[in-house]
C-alpha cells in the first residue's frame, strides 16, 4: 500500500526513523487524554516524549515531515481502533480519540518549530488515498 508516501524517499525516512516511534507514543497519549487540547507550552515545558518526537521530526527533510507524520498518525489510529474493539469501546469515543490524533499531528510541526512546515494539512477524517 502506498499510503501517504507518494515520495519513496519519505517512506524510507519513515522507516529509518522507526516510524517516528516517539511521535506515535505522543499521539497515542494525547488521544487518550480527555480534557481540552494541549496546554500552550513554551519549549521549556516540553514533556520528554514530545521533545523526542520533535527530534525525530527535525531529522526528516521538510518535504517528508507531513507524510511521515501522516504515517505515524495512521499507525496510532489503527492501534486505537484495535484496542477499542478489545475493550468494546463505543464508536463515539473512538471517533473522538481518532480526531484528537489528527488534531495533535496537524500542529506538531509548529509545536516543534520545524522550519518551513507550520501545519500539516490533514483533512478532518482523512480517508485520503491510502
Curated annotation (Swiss-Prot):
Function (record text): Inhibits trypsin with a Ki of 7 x 10(-6) M.
Organism, scientific name: Mutarda arvensis (Charlock mustard)
Ranges annotated as biased composition (Low complexity): 32-49
KW Disulfide bond (keyword) present: yes
Stored InterPro entries: Bifun_inhib/LTP/seed_sf, Bifunc_inhib/LTP/seed_store, Napin/2SS/CON
Gene3D superfamilies listed in its UniProt record: Plant lipid-transfer and hydrophobic proteins
Bilayer-spanning residue ranges: none
A GO term for molecular function: nutrient reservoir activity
Domain of life: Eukaryota
SMART domains for the chain: AAI
Ranges for region Disordered: 27-49
One family name in Pfam for this protein: Tryp_alpha_amyl
Keywords, sorted A to Z: Disulfide bond, Seed storage protein, Storage protein
Protein name: Trypsin inhibitor
Subunit structure comment from the entry: The protein consists of two chains linked by disulfide bonds.
Family from the record: Belongs to the 2S seed storage albumins family.
